[in-house]
Amino acid sequence: MMEIDKYKNLRYRLMESEKWPLKYMFKFIVPNEAGKVDQVKALLPKGGKVTFKHTANLKHVSVTCVALMESADQIIVITEKADKIEGVIVL
């Protein structure tokens, strides 16, 4: 139930924006294991500017993507899919 509320809140905040398409920044903390970074990268919009930063101990990778998005629903779909990958933290 809490997860649904989180996305409802995000959708509401996004819908407050009157300017679509808009630049949106996705940010995820991803375990540096078993292709999980590639799984997250595959979800990101094509043409987005993606950057990676490893933690000091190399256990996690911060994945950031700034992309022009057409709708709140597009953003929610990507966020939900990333959140389902084990160990991924959505920021």
Model-predicted regions and their roles:
Residues 1-62, 66-91:
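Long, contiguous binding/interaction regions
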